[in-house]
Amino acid sequence: MSGHSKWSTIKRKKGANDAKRGKIFTRLIKEITVAARGGGGDPEGNPRLRSAILVAKSENMPKDNITRAIKKGTGEIAGEVYDEILYEGYGPGGVAVLVECMTDNRNRTVADIRHYFAKNNGNLGEAGCVSWMFEKKGLILVDKATITEDELMDQALEAGAEDVVEDETEFQVLTNPTELDAVRGAMEAAGIAFVDASISMLPKNVVDVTDEKVGKNLLRLLESLEDHDDVQNVHSNFDIDEELMEQLAE
């Protein structure tokens, strides 16, 4: 099974715990703030902000929190200034890892990220060392139990999607990154429910992980990165057997 897909499933399952600790809200507030700073506070004219607000609402973030984050981004009220940084490196087994961060202290963040890589038999690399192995896509996940592949394919392509890929429990609807918001809106209008919708970095090729020790170190690295307050998203290109993945995820 694709480790990228499986890891996404694990992240969503642990998301309930993250929400209790406020991590999801913290990440969403950062995204809204940065989106508003870069493209203005009007979601109608700022697709990134519009997308961030939709995600925040799906996580039941209070409207006041959303409004305050937008105003911080536009400078109407005082707030932290976050830098967006993409860190790249290799995890155990030669797995490529991308780490998207938003931070108010670059030195602190890079020191922590480098430590996580080194601690788990990986190494933080230079800019561009692995990003070429990934392709930016809009990704909409749909539960297979809610719709047939043929029906979804017809609806998704009509909505402007590029392709539909089947996985163990989900369909992955792929879009041009700039078309994600439009495709998602068209699918919603057609009554298609989805599990998640986001801009993602999809691997062009995958690295097979068959060794249990390598797998443990890899998951520990990914979990450490995901749990860091400055990390927004983590992408990797590993592929792993379903049985081994289940053992490691326990």
From Swiss-Prot:
Keywords assigned: Cytoplasm, DNA-binding, Transcription, Transcription regulation
Gene Ontology MF, one: DNA binding
GO terms under cellular component: cytosol
InterPro entries registered for this protein in UniProt: Integrase-like_N, TACO1_YebC-like_2nd/3rd_dom, TACO1_YebC_N, Transcrip_reg_TACO1-like, Transcrip_reg_TACO1-like_dom3, YebC-like
One BP annotation, GO: regulation of DNA-templated transcription
Keyword Transcription: yes
Subcellular location per the Swiss-Prot or TrEMBL entry: Cytoplasm
Tree of life domain: Bacteria
Similarity remark: Belongs to the TACO1 family.
Protein name per UniProt: Probable transcriptional regulatory protein DP2908
Organism: Desulfotalea psychrophila (strain LSv54 / DSM 12343)
